[in-house]
């Protein structure tokens, strides 16, 4: 797990940074090239040795997610089709690899209740910061509080014990990019520097299939092999990804 510096910008609440570190079990490492930076507006992740990559933060209120919510494909989005949204059916979903919460937010904006699991404390802190700002927003706060929640836990452990059982478990494990690093999106380069590869991702499929009551959906790059080497004939395809769909295990 990558080390981080914990920094507060001028005008930010230094006491809030200390409370955040205590809550998420984060320790300041002065030699780390990654930093969690509390600004007066939000919590950000920065790669100090590559400042041109910019800052990573979770924003459910504005930016690309707001645009996607207002003008995106809605129920026609591939992730919506993959989890089975249809008519009045809005499945209860566990996103076991929440990351920056983008797909989870899309599903919540369409009406699903989504529980996000995130094991990395720095990522969980970023997600929670974004959630709290989203909960406080007059437009999306009322439904966001009802539909999108965060659990800081190891997915492998949580999938064995989580109650109530969800209808759908969604998995989007980190997979090495095929492109040269310069072509990988800047935000993903910063994010990957923090979390590394999901080396234990294959171990998620079986417990996910035991927990879900309807289906497990695994998002993969189009060139990636199936998770855990388990092929399935059922998939929703996009130009660059596929959503492999698995039946539950009895």
UniProtKB/Swiss-Prot annotation:
GO cellular component, as recorded: cytoplasm
One annotated GO molecular function is: rRNA (guanine-N2-)-methyltransferase activity
Q: What is this protein called?
A: Ribosomal RNA small subunit methyltransferase J
Where in the cell does this protein reside? Cytoplasm
Return the InterPro entries for the record: 16SrRNA_methylTrfase_J, SAM-dependent_MTases_sf
Family listed: Belongs to the methyltransferase superfamily. RsmJ family.
Q: Where does S-adenosyl-L-methionine bind?
A: 102-103, 118-119, 154-155, 172
Short name of any one Pfam family annotated for the protein: SAM_MT
